[in-house]
Amino acid sequence: MAGCTRKLTHLRKRIHRPRRRTTRRWKRWFKFRKRKGEKRPRPNHKAVARRAKLKFSTSEKLHWPEQELAKKSILNAEDSLIIDNKRSISHLSSGVLKDIFTTGTSSYNVLLQSKEEKKYHSQKQSSSTYSKRCRKPSKSPNTSRSKDPRRMKALVPVTSSGTWYCLERRPAVFVTSSVSSPVKFTHDISVTGNGIVLPPKPKSKVKWCHFSTLPKPKPQLSRSFEKGDDFSGKKFCILTAIKPTNLEKEKLRFFKSDYTYNPQFEYANPALPSVLAKHSHASDRFLKQIVVHLTEDLLSRASMTVVNGCPTLTINVSTAREHWLEGMLRHEIGTHYFRGINNLQQPWNSWTGRKKHELKPNNPTEEGLASIHSVLFRKDPFLWRAALLYYTVYQASQMSFCELFKDIGRFVKDPNTRWDYCVRAKRGWTDTSQPGCFSKDQVYLDGILQILRYRDTIDFHLLTALGKVSYEDVDRLKGLAVTENMRVPHFLQDHGRYMEHLEKIMEVNELTDRELKDLI
């Protein structure tokens, strides 16, 4: 039992007396304990004294005593802990001591800069060069001279005769100043024996900047439309560039003028004149076959009549809206999305690939196919919207905004609906009092009629699987295409039913193969 107590006491002493290099000592202790019949070696008194000196000289807790201690000193020159004065004696000038003790930046210790003035200046230059290289904020001269706390030297006054002790990690050195210091201190410095570890010097947080030669990624724009440049070199989608910024303001002004004021549109990033000129040519190819009348007074959903020898389609707008959402999903998802996904797998998925394989523009096939899918499963699949857009664009190329607004009033009674059609046709133009149009809206009807014209020879399943291609390129590209894992909408799975819906569209809109052959 006594042996156990002795072992526990010994363990407690080891636990409550932490020293430096703990891991190495514990390994050594366990190694000795493993040896059978051998006792733990007793500590070396000289080593204990040496570690005490290191512990004492590494960090000291300094304070200003309240009483006058000018003639008192905790450290004595005859003490055994103060080493002998034969080792590295440093001589400090009074200027260095004055500069050290009058800075006011060291609250706990006073630093010894160097042995000589020359070495001090060289270290200062090297530290300033390093700080510039690291892009650290500027420091005061006092702060820049501070070193690692573990390497600091502390000067402690022992007597009032100009004698100083230099304390560092090595055994303390007795320093005698050859020149008496003219500085008078109101309080002396005393050193306590219980040393604590001084907190490390606070490091200023430096914000590192990363400089890369790579250009920043730009937001991707839609490839479906041409781009317009602004003065800063940025590229914008043509549909974004021609969107007026003062649309609501001009709309109120137009309605207050009783439809006599021609709006003056403004644009944040106007399209280039060359781009507008390319889209300002309207066609009258299908005008003689189209008359559309939108109204809310019609009892039925729609009706087809003949007025003055011209076929007229009358649409009840209020009842037709309930089918728009389903048609919009087939238009955007079932056509544009699926063809876009399939196009990514093909060799012509880039502009370079399209040029290499000599592909024709995907419009009007793209928008014509999407417009057909919008009305594919409707009870009355009228093509009145595509026809009205085609007509409005052509009239806009011949009329001012006010004249166009009055002209389509024959077919559209609601002023807000008429405003929307006129704005679409006049997009990109600043002064709408002049004739001019944005001709993109004509591709819907143009594409519809071309697809219906060649519906018997087009492979619609392959037309979707090949991606963004024209129906004219399908036969030529099918041998080069990647057809595995292609996505096709559900309404194209049954080819027979799909063709029946196309025939119904022809019948409802009173289109015949002979008329289509004459037009196309």
UniProtKB/Swiss-Prot annotation:
Broadest EC class assigned to this enzyme: hydrolase
The record's Gene Ontology biological-process terms are: proteolysis
Which InterPro entries does this chain map to? Answer: MATCAP (IPR012548)
Give the E.C. number(s). 3.4.17.-
Q: Which UniProt keywords apply?
A: Carboxypeptidase, Hydrolase, Metal-binding, Metalloprotease, Protease, Zinc
Give cofactor(s), names only.
Answer: Zn(2+)
Residues the entry annotates as binding Zn(2+): H331, H336, E367
Q: Does the keyword Hydrolase apply?
A: yes
Any idea which residues are catalytic in this one?
Answer: E332
Q: Which GO terms describe its molecular function?
A: carboxypeptidase activity; metal ion binding; metallopeptidase activity
- SMART domains named in the record: DUF1704
What does the record give as the function of this protein? Putative tyrosine carboxypeptidase.
Specify the protein name: Putative tyrosine carboxypeptidase MATCAP2
Q: Which organism is it from?
A: Homo sapiens
